[in-house]
């Protein structure tokens, strides 16, 4: 079976090849994202495509796939918003996704961003890179063991983040719509209002549910402690970007770290150095560095996470091809 894998970076290629030894697919990995007619036409002669985030299987591209004879559409992501699922079903495409992969990858990045903001390391190293070795008042910080950390969303990633913060000595509290068992040793589950009221650092690990809209709103931010740090390594749509900008500018937020943006496809994966960003909110966020830290959706950009995503995607394809079904089928 011939498989086209989109958005594969050079460092990931050995993982795609190593994982394929078990499956024996005829794979071609390209760095391109599925975002134009031309990139869709790359699938000519292939039986299946494996997408990643910011690859858009919209009506235009799905029609091209159908015309080219592509049989299966897979995404090596937990999110599936980049696929027009209803139209793909109309065209008869079996689809599958990767519901989970290394939770440590995303949790570690969230903790890293929080600690960079807490200890002001981005600010400090940007100065020392210019040979300014003075220590100023902005560099002064609390120790994390003297902080309360709030985790919004106690799924697999949120629980790992809670464990890491607990291991560093922080008092960890968390909120989830479900009662979570087995976390008592490292996290106390409380209401969202209590998380907002008490936390010096809040890290978001909730799923995005379109019908519910953003979680981080002006009201959410208003309830937070003055000067608290907020981190979002979950979904860009969970955050009202304009409200966050206002909170950072006013000093309500001590800092904001994110690995995701609402509408990130317009900037992530592109070198826009020296250019004015089309989205004025993104331009404002960038200008707020080092109080705002942005990473370009690389939470899953680790050895273990990529291995998990590729292995599950290959297995999904095998299951769909052999049985027409798989545990991770998009229905």
UniProtKB/Swiss-Prot annotation:
Pfam families named in the record: 2-Hacid_dh (PF00389), 2-Hacid_dh_C (PF02826)
Q: Which GO terms describe its molecular function?
A: D-lactate dehydrogenase activity; NAD binding
Q: Which UniProt keywords apply?
A: NAD, Oxidoreductase
Catalysed reaction equations from the record: (R)-2-hydroxyglutarate + NAD(+) = 2-oxoglutarate + NADH + H(+)
Write out the catalytic residues in the record.
235, 264, 297
Q: Which InterPro entries match?
A: D-isomer_2_OHA_DH_cat_dom, D-isomer_DH_CS, D-isomer_DH_NAD-bd, NAD(P)-bd_dom_sf
EC number per UniProt: 1.1.1.399
What residues does NAD(+) bind to?
156-157, 176, 206-207, 212, 233-235, 259
Protein's job: Catalyzes the reduction of 2-oxoglutarate to 2-hydroxyglutarate.
Q: Into which family does the record put it?
A: Belongs to the D-isomer specific 2-hydroxyacid dehydrogenase family.
Q: What is this protein called?
A: (R)-2-hydroxyglutarate dehydrogenase
Gene giving rise to this polypeptide: hgdH
């Amino acid at each position: 079976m011939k498989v086209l894998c989109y958005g594969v970076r050079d460092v990931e290629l050995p993982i795609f090849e190593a994982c394929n030894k078990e499956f024996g697919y005829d794979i071609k990995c390209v760095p391109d994202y599925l975002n134009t007619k031309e990139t869709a036409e790359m699938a000519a002669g292939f039986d299946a495509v494996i997408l990643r985030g910011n690859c858009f299987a919209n009506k235009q591209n799905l029609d091209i796939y159908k015309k080219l004879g592509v049989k299966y559409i897979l995404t090596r992501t937990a999110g599936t918003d980049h696929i027009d699922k209803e139209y793909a079903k109309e065209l008869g495409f079996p689809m599958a996704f990767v519901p989970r992969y290394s939770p440590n990858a995303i949790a570690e990045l969230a903790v890293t961003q929080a600690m960079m903001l807490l200890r002001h390391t981005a600010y400090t190293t940007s100065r020392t890179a210019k040979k300014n070795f003075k220590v100023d008042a902005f560099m002064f910080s609390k120790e994390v063991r003297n902080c309360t950390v709030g985790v919004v969303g106690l799924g697999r990633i949120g629980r790992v983040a809670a464990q890491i913060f607990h291991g560093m000595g922080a008092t960890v509290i968390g909120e989830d719509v479900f009662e979570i068992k087995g976390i008592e040793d490292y996290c106390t589950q409380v209401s969202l209002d209590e998380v907002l009221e008490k936390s010096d650092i809040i890290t978001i690990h909730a799923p995005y549910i379109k019908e519910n809209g953003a979680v981080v709103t002006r009201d959410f931010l208003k309830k937070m402690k003055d000067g608290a740090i907020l981190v979002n390594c979950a979904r860009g749509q969970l955050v009202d970007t304009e409200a966050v900008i206002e909170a950072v500018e006013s000093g309500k937020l001590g800092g904001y770290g994110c690995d995701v943006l609402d509408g990130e496809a317009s900037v992530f994966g592109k070198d826009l150095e020296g250019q004015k960003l089309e989205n004025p909110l993104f331009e404002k966020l960038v200008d707020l560095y080092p109080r705002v830290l942005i990473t370009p959706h690389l939470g899953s950009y680790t050895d273990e996470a990529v291995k998990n995503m590729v292995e599950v995607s290959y297995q999904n394809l095998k299951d769909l091809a052999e049985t027409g079904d798989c545990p991770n089928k998009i229905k």
